[in-house]
Amino acid sequence: MINDKLPKIWHGGDYNPEQWDSKEIWDEDVRMFKLAGIDVATLNVFSWALNQPNEDTYNFDWLDEKINRLYENGIYTCLATSTAAHPAWMAKKYPDVLRVDFYGRKRKFGSRHNSCPNSPTYRKYSERIAETLAERYKDHPAVLIWHVSNEYGGYCYCDNCQDAFRNWLSDKYGTLEKLNKAWNTGFWGHTFYEWDEIVAPNMLSEKREDNVSDFQGISLDYRRFQSDRLLDCYKLEYNAIRKHVPTSIPITTNLMGTYPMLDYFKWAKEMDVVSWDNYPSIDTPFSYTAMTHDLMRGLKGGKPFMLMEQTPSQQNWQPYNSLKRPGVMRLWSYQAIGRGADTILYFQLRRSVGACEKYHGAVIEHVGHEHTRVFNEVAQLGQELNGLSDTLLDARVNAKVAIVFDWENRWATELSSGPSVSLDYVNEVHKYYDALYKLNVQVDMIGVEEDLSKYDVVIAPVLYMVKEGYAAKVEKFVENGGTFLTTFFSGIVNETDIVTLGGYPGELRKVLGIWAEEIDALHPDETNQIVVKGSRGILSGKYSCNLLFDLIHTEGAEAVAEYGSDFYKGMPVLTVNKFGKGKAWYVASSPDAEFLVDFLQTVCEEAGVEPLLDVPAGVETTERVKDGQTYLFVLNHNNDEVTIELHGSQYREVLTDEQVSGNLVLKEKGVLILAKV
């Protein structure tokens, strides 16, 4: 578990008492926290200016008081380091802390995410305050976990970053000869003869307004570099804390799901527990949120994660900040728990009275009392989580299907000039996840370093970049009986975005048994057809596809379906290749949702992968396992009640402790946690 001092699913969230200079409000907060079943408060996230009013002075008296007051009332602390926004005095005295943006403009003091990760000043003072906090609170019994900074993100293009980038490149490549080869600098006369000729790629150099780069290798390495340097800032604080704090107290920082700018698989290696902030928009598919939970779980090989933030009701920063309808907050909380979360924490516990987050939802609203819909829903959930105790803590998700997600592959795809501006890597990954979600098939989201042998089916949509050794890894997996599936625009380049010669899909050509001669790109509104030859499983008839169209030739693979129109009518669009004891599928275009459901049902049936439960549309299933006991979550996202058929199995419904079997009526936004008897 995260910390055995609190052996239950934690319930709490961000608390900013420094925003109210009122003992009466603080006392009321504690009273209402207890009513709501709040047992963890995240403190000190944005308090650097309060903690350090000048270069030589620290003030933690206020923090002592708040930690102690909460602890006296049974509420633990998730202690942040306050470094998410530097103080104004620092920006004034040491302007090197201020970022230079993508357009080459030097930022002024303001907002947050405003510190240059390569600023000597920022690195010095952030490390120092983290260590000062650790020395002060290392033995405090209230502190369950340390929270470094907040939602790291954003790049900088200043001279310090440029110099650090050159050093990073020197360490990576060793010589300019190797760098020039890796970047293909013979193109457009870009050969470098001195390290200081290399400049940061932004709008003043290699980048374009639409995020495409003229030199993908340069821009790809700059993303790697910035991700690494921001990670290094985290590690500076982590190591400063760990000097004084025992390993029994974990250290984390809050991630942001599919956030594009940081390689979270690399970050997770440095985190004791993964935590993340879940803020779906009004039109986010439920399956997308489920996928992101699974991705966060996958960052550390399936270990449970923390839901560090979610709003109790509405947000403030999206175009349309709708309220969570009655029951939705509870429903989405159990969605997180069902997919591996061992905490349910909110932003924020009391609503801010000023600045940009004053309209962001909170447990305690501006009215200041507990007689609100949101508070009552939070309190109900708090009561249920107390009742669950440690039942679900450390429970794992066992999946036989994995989907590969790789940030560097995503970057390379996004930076490429062509073949289509509409190609969205995350969207293509989600399309495959969504089909499996509808089929009630449990999925792990994995990185390219993950062991494949524990899976029956591995799906790698748009595997544009094939890293060294990965093709051999796939071949071994398939040879040993696994099913591998990839798609159009795969196997094109290596890790520095240099095309693999010899024909697409490059190093995957052998295992797939195909050659892609050309890639057609059409407007997303223009479609072709996937015409199945005969039938395979439930796959039959015609389906639609769009976006990109690989024109492929079989080299040992079987053509299962063909294009239905255009000059490549009759050419293969879906192939399967027997390889060793297994098989490898190739989908040469971007199919419609109906095709993916039918296709992946066929793939899973052939691989012996079964769904968790047959349920109506709009109902989500997921399962966790602990000590041999399975816990099946059934979540009704519909606005109407549904009937769940248990097909003769006997269960104990965990939330009510009732024995159930046969057909169950599940109300709108309802939740079941079924332990098999």
Swiss-Prot record:
The keyword Nucleotide-binding does not apply. One of its GO terms (biological process) is galactose metabolic process. GO terms for molecular function: beta-galactosidase activity; metal ion binding. It catalyses: Hydrolysis of terminal non-reducing beta-D-galactose residues in beta-D-galactosides. SUPFAM superfamilies: (Trans)glycosidases, Class I glutamine amidotransferase-like. The active site is at E151, E309. Keywords: Glycosidase, Hydrolase, Metal-binding, Zinc. It holds the Pfam family Glyco_hydro_42M. One of its GO terms (cellular component) is beta-galactosidase complex. Zn(2+) binds at C116, C156, C158, C161. Dimer. Belongs to the glycosyl hydrolase 42 family. Hydrolyzes o-nitrophenyl-beta-D-galactopyranoside (ONPG), p-nitrophenyl-beta-D-galactopyranoside (PNPG), 5-bromo-4-chloro-3-indoyl-beta-D-galactosde (X-gal), o-nitrophenyl-beta-D-fucopyranoside (ONPF) and p-nitrophenyl-beta-D-fucopyranoside (PNPF) with greatest activity towards ONPG and PNPG and low levels of activity with ONPF and PNPF. Detectable, but very low levels of activity towards p-nitrophenyl-beta-lactose (PNPL), p-nitrophenyl-beta-cellobiose (PNPC), p-nitrophenyl-alpha-galactopyranoside (PNP-alpha-G), and p-nitrophenyl-beta-xylopyranoside (PNPX). This is Beta-galactosidase BgaA. It comes from Planococcus sp. (strain 'SOS Orange'). The lineage of its organism: Bacteria, Bacillati, Bacillota, Bacilli, Bacillales. The gene is bgaA.
